[in-house]
Amino acid sequence: RSSVQAGALRYRYSIVTGGAGSGKTELAKSLMTQVREQGGKVAATAMTGKAATLLGEDATTLHKLLGYGGGGYSVSTVDADLVLVDEAGMLTWHTLYRLLLACRGQVVLIGDPQQLAPVGATPVMAELLTVLPVVRLGEEGSKGSLLVKVQVIRFASEALLLYQLRKIVRGYQDTGVEWQALSPVYAGGLGVDRLNRWLQEIMNPDGPPCHGGFRTGDRVIVTKTRYDIGQRAVNGEQGRVLGSMGDTIALRLDSGREVALRAEELRLSYCITVHKAQGSRYERVVFIIPERECGAFAVEERMQYVGRTRGREATVCMVY
């Protein structure tokens, strides 16, 4: 590990890459500790709010560090000896340009080149890997371990898929297993929106009603970062509804923080998109693949890779 850290900090600009579970976030924390112990200043960032929370309480999104707002980026200089960017596979060229323009110290980009690029954007990571120094973490072991973790089941009808999905998630609920359902899309019969309402009726049919169609006990995901409340809530964080609080909804985030947000700042999260799951892992994952409805988009290589690698213990791919 010490030689890997040295390699990552040897150059002004470098990339740390590896597959799911290869230790990228752990290495990022080690780099932060090393630089701080030497008296240096670190700016820890990620491309998503959820990924930033995994780096520590003082981490933030890269967009916030650079002062992104309606008029563009307002920060011209970042006062740090080291800037870390986790989930760098989601970088766009313009954001990278603003980052390099503002930074005076070292920049370490951390990510998985096989993950999804931002919607509608050109993948930046693949090109950077050809020109910047690269530290690679345990990729072969990570890929090999996935072979025994992923089960693929094809269904002759949507009804059969939903019947089996009901059995699986009820089994997880009965045994207290942490799980997450994924779909590539929001719309359609097997999209996130419909599956969430369907799963709400299975997992929490009797929860007391709250604003916006939510129920006490529902699993939800934050859709808008809020730093202006007592305990921050960031886009992509998940939690559980505690009940209504005036015109807001009180929830306990998975981090343990309790916040109150408006209904429009939340979505049900029994099922989330593959894009939203990027940067997170769960004990068990059920990856619903609406192949007939979505065609090539649902089976695109990067989409499949991210969906299949979100489970720490096992992933069940359900294809129709």
Give residue ranges: language-model regions.
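C-terminal accessory regions
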Residues: 237-320
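Cofactor-binding loop segments of dinucleotide-utilizing enzymes, especially the Rossmann-like FAD-
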Residues: 47, 112, 139, 184-186, ...
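Structural beta-sheet core signal
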Residues: 44, 109, 181-183, 287, ...
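Residue-level signature of catalytic and energy-coupling elements of molecular machines
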Residues: 86, 112, 185, 217, ...
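ASCE P-loop NTPase helicase motor core
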Residues: 5, 9-152, 157
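Conserved helicase motor core of P-loop NTPases
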Residues: 2-7, 11-12, 114-234, 240-242, ...
